[in-house]
Amino acid sequence: MEGGKGPRLRDFLSGSLATWALGLAGLVGEAEDSEGEEEEEEEEPPLWLEKRFLRLSDGALLLRVLGIIAPSSRGGPRMLRGLDGPAAWRVWNLNHLWGRLRDFYQEELQLLILSPPPDLQTLGFDPLSEEAVEQLEGVLRLLLGASVQCEHRELFIRHIQGLSLEVQSELAAAIQEVTQPGAGVVLALSGPDPGELAPAELEMLSRSLMGTLSKLARERDLGAQRLAELLLEREPLCLRPEAPSRAPAEGPSHHLALQLANAKAQLRRLRQELEEKAELLLDSQAEVQGLEAEIRRLRQEAQALSGQAKRAELYREEAEALRERAGRLPRLQEELRRCRERLQAAEAYKSQLEEERVLSGVLEASKALLEEQLEAARERCARLHETQRENLLLRTRLGEAHAELDSLRHQVDQLAEENVELELELQRSLEPPPGSPGEAPLAGAAPSLQDEVREAEAGRLRTLERENRELRGLLQVLQGQPGGQHPLLEAPREDPVLPVLEEAPQTPVAFDHSPQGLVQKARDGGPQALDLAPPALDSVLEASAECPQAPDSDPQEAESPLQAAAMDPQASDWSPQESGSPVETQESPEKAGRRSSLQSPASVAPPQGPGTKIQAPQLLGGETEGREAPQGELVPEAWGLRQEGPEHKPGPSEPSSVQLEEQEGPNQGLDLATGQAEAREHDQRLEGTVRDPAWQKPQQKSEGALEVQVWEGPIPGESLASGVAEQEALREEVAQLRRKAEALGDELEAQARKLEAQNTEAARLSKELAQARRAEAEAHREAEAQAWEQARLREAVEAAGQELESASQEREALVEALAAAGRERRQWEREGSRLRAQSEAAEERMQVLESEGRQHLEEAERERREKEALQAELEKAVVRGKELGDRLEHLQRELEQAALERQEFLREKESQHQRYQGLEQRLEAELQAAATSKEEALMELKTRALQLEEELFQLRQGPAGLGPKKRAEPQLVETQNVRLIEVERSNAMLVAEKAALQGQLQHLEGQLGSLQGRAQELLLQSQRAQEHSSRLQAEKSVLEIQGQELHRKLEVLEEEVRAARQSQEETRGQQQALLRDHKALAQLQRRQEAELEGLLVRHRDLKANMRALELAHRELQGRHEQLQAQRASVEAQEVALLAERERLMQDGHRQRGLEEELRRLQSEHDRAQMLLAELSRERGELQGERGELRGRLARLELERAQLEMQSQQLRESNQQLDLSACRLTTQCELLTQLRSAQEEENRQLLAEVQALSRENRELLERSLESRDHLHREQREYLDQLNALRREKQKLVEKIMDQYRVLEPVPLPRTKKGSWLADKVKRLMRPRREGGPPGGLRLGADGAGSTESLGGPPETELPEGREADGTGSPSPAPMRRAQSSLCLRDETLAGGQRRKLSSRFPVGRSSESFSPGDTPRQRFRQRHPGPLGAPVSHSKGPGVGWENSAETLQEHETDANREGPEVQEPEKRPLTPSLSQ
């Protein structure tokens, strides 16, 4: 697909017509292609667009759609495939489609298509062109207009309503263009009578007809011209293009007589219908009043019945809740057992979790240690390899620097020899004739020039030696740097290079002495000195310009990446020196005519060294040729030098050439300003050198000689002739020097390119270094990922331990939520029943409003009021729905609050458990403290005994010991007595303390028993809460299901109300249009009667013109048929050429793809080679690392032995954990005791359930007794309904009699009919289709209403005459289909009903619950009988469960059915004892 066709196809396929047409695939049986479309969407967008467009343009889908629109038109929906190819059957399908569509417009819709027929050849053989897209768009527009005017238009309108609003608006505009005759697309064949039209309207009609005829004539001319062109292409020798000689108008004038007759007939028919409708209006008003009174009475009765139905539903809900509670008991027991099992598993998981935590901690510590050692070894290896590479690079660069230095010295020697030769030639050329006064000054000038050359050479050698020393210092600094840095690859770390680069611009001062000295001589010596200065300048400049040739002599300089930037300051001096050239070249042409122009370049030249020497010969050439060449010739050369300059701009960090080229444009002005500032600084330096006495002596000599030469007088004619020849020779030499300068400039450019290549190589190396660092970082990240994986595993183990707690918390939260939701359940159901009643009332009211709107024209106001009331009720229902949503949100918030409360309860429970553990720990601590205190008391007693012994010993050695020995023995006895007394006292104190500690221990044991009792109570409470939560969860699920049903019903009601509102708007628009048409017809009748004669005359003229046009049309048609055959052959050749072109394009695409694949493979091959080199280098590194890792492995084995020791210690700790597990088993025994208590409670609940079942049987017997009363009332209601049906039948027969009398004259088209007659037929059909004998007639309660109309809902097509093709479509088939669907549902439900006993008549089953779907039956499906007992099927005095379920179902059916029916006002309400 070409580039221009893609957007056009995309716009067309995203438009409204294509969206509508492709969406009809599901209606015509092509929905199975959806999977293919999804596969196409996954392909490339152009191919997907082509496939979707070709699916539309092949005509198969459109023919199927047209088969639904016009099934009885010409031929069936036949599709021809496999003729000569896809293009041929595409042309055949589209031709067939166009013929059937044109016939449908002309025969069925009485419309003539004015738009030209589509170019079928373009659509068939070039379907992707813009012309084909436009032709297909026109066909789709006509198909859309036919779909909304056919018999099955409701089907297509529903499809259009299912699209987006934007697409609907666009489709509405397209439908308006196609369906309105005045839009220029179609023309009405049966219009009003020209005599009945006003003059203005008649003139407008005639103008539109003339415009249509002229358009048709233009299209005919275009078609004839195209046919002639095709004939010329087919047979260029036989046929010649013939211009259309005449252009008679061609149009549908032969239909004008038919239009006039149709208009008159329509006017008469409208008058007759107006009279009939006026009579019908009076009759229908009386009927409407009676029906309104009846409707009011029925509403009151329905309200009374709805209250009783609500009470019955409440009773039924209570019984269901009791049954569900009884059925949840086994499930609660099973949940309790599962919870206990999960508790045991949780304890086992906890112990395993602790073991895993300890083990993972040890593994993490060892892993961290190993990672640190590995990282240190990697860093050392990296530093070692980097330092080795840097040493090798520095050695190679040092050798290159020595080689460059030798080459530079050799070049300096050559330049000195060339300068001497040039000096000798200059002397010979400047020698005056013998005897002239100029010999003395020339003899004095030669030594000064030689001295200058030697001084320049010496300065150059000094600068080279200084640079050599600086390079050696830089090398030493680089060798002394640590291995972690990369001085060669990272430019910002090259700090030692910066002083060299800063000093580099100052070196050219030595080279500028000689030209500056000559300039100074020129300033002081006058014009004669200027004749001497140019040769000297040329010699010096030539010597300085040939110096840059040295770098080219060594072709191996490009091997080092940063050689030109860091190790060769000469290149850095040469490369940026062209930046100042624009200043010199701009000033030199301005002063080319004067001989003192040398002052401006010398004073303005920037201090950039050899750059000024390169540019000086050009300036000198400008002086010598200034009288002949214009100023404009030098300006391009200057600008060329300026453009070369910024490429070599110097800088301390040596930026790459790519950056300099990017900055070339905006930095030119800055280069000029900086060049001027540097020039001023350089002038100051040169003035300082000029003042040097070593330069002043030869200068004074030359000045004296020049002055003598100037003042001696004019030069003879021979000297002038020789001077002219010498000037020519000098010019030639200057030209040679200029060429040499250009060659040097080229060499500088080559060096610049080499520098760029070196910079790129350095960038590549830096990228490789970055890649290596990234690989290292990835290795670190992998290690971190492994650590994170271990942490994740630990978290997963912890989550497994916390899963039980979270599950229990969620279950408890659901319990609380469902408890809150259960309180609102009844309110929901009450609201739902009320909404259902309101929706049914709204349905009936809408149907009544629709029937009144279609039958009576003057009931528009009353319908509007009814509609407003309905909208108000709908808004109230929406508000109620919003309130229910708010309540639901409130319930959700309460659920969240209950969950929070449950969490708080769990936290309190945990805190109590922690408090219990704390008390145990406290008791143990107190016991330990008591033991320690007892030991301390014993120690104190021992210390006191020792003190007493010491005192006794001191007393024995005191003054008492000095007495007689007789006193020693009594004192010893006394001390022993005192000591015994103290020991007894201390023992008594210890006994008292022991008794106190035993009392505290008993008190703590009592507290422990109370805490255990509270823990048991909390466990019981948690179990009860779990039971309550499960019960509330079931209630919540029931409530959610009911809420969803209510929401769905509310949405259905809103959709129905929207559809009713839309139909009302349509009917109102039709009524207003009919009123306007009636008024317009009355006016047109008065106007057209006056102008009928003139129109008849014009009609005769138009008929004559029409005959002439028909003759011309027949001739053109014959020629068109001849040309069509020739065109088919030409188009077949075009198709073959197009296929060949597409094949060639595919070959070209395939060739380009292969070329791209080849380039990609080459790049991958290069990259693989580079990777192979890197891998070989890394392999050597890894071999070194392997030796280190072996040593580490030995160390790790030692650490492993240590870890095994630690694991032995952990096993001992696990034994302690086993002891704690034994304590947990005791707790499990307590839980088994609780289980036995729970089973006892379950047995009590079973007894209660049996009692409830007995009560339920009693309630069922009462309901059977109340059933007789209900059926007696039902018979009375049926009698009243029969009376109402008889009255309604009389009204229907009266309406039929009126329509038989007032039936209008049938139209000539037999396929159209009156939808009102069809409706009356359907009103009469229920009488013929009676119910079965001996029972209640099915659907009899709605026989006379509009709800009983319509056929089966599967066809969605009209019945009776419409099915045969002889009837007209009814304005409300959708409503009839819905009402018939309701009747069929009721009939099927009544047929599937089962009898309870023979004494109850057959009625309709409940629509709220299907058979086998009640809560009781679901309960019986889960449990075979009450509490496991078998189901009783007997019909004796003991009513079984199944019969009771049927009785309840029938009772629900009658309660729901008797709501909208008629009943007596005196009927008593149901007794409150009714329960289900």
From Swiss-Prot:
GO cellular component terms listed in the entry, alphabetical order: centrosome; cytoplasm; cytosol; endoplasmic reticulum; Golgi apparatus; membrane; nucleoplasm
Residue ranges that the Swiss-Prot or TrEMBL entry lists as coiled coil: 253-481, 720-1303
Positions with biased composition (Polar residues): 572-586
Keywords noted in UniProt: Coiled coil, Cytoplasm, Cytoskeleton, Endoplasmic reticulum, Golgi apparatus, Membrane, Phosphoprotein, Stress response
Alphabetical list of InterPro entries matching this protein: CH_dom_sf (IPR036872), HOOK_N (IPR043936)
Induction or repression: By endoplasmic reticulum stress.
Membrane topology: Peripheral membrane protein
Main localization (coarse): membrane
Keyword Coiled coil: yes
Phosphoserine PTM sites in chain numbering: S436, S596, S1348, S1379
Expression sites (tissue/organ): Expressed in endothelium (at protein level). Expressed in NK cells (at protein level).
Assembly mode: Homodimer. Interacts with DOCK8. Interacts (via C-terminus) with intact microtubules. Interacts with dynein-dynactin motor complex. Interacts (via C-terminus) with HSPA5.
Function, in words: Acts as a positive regulator of T-cell maturation and inflammatory function. Required for several functions of T-cells, in both the CD4(+) and the CD8(+) compartments and this includes expression of cell surface markers of activation, proliferation, and cytokine production in response to specific or non-specific stimulation. Enhances NK cell cytotoxicity by positively regulating polarization of microtubule-organizing center (MTOC) to cytotoxic synapse, lytic granule transport along microtubules, and dynein-mediated clustering to MTOC.
Assigned protein family: Belongs to the CCDC88 family.
The protein, known as: Coiled-coil domain-containing protein 88B
Species of the source: Homo sapiens
Gene that encodes the chain: CCDC88B
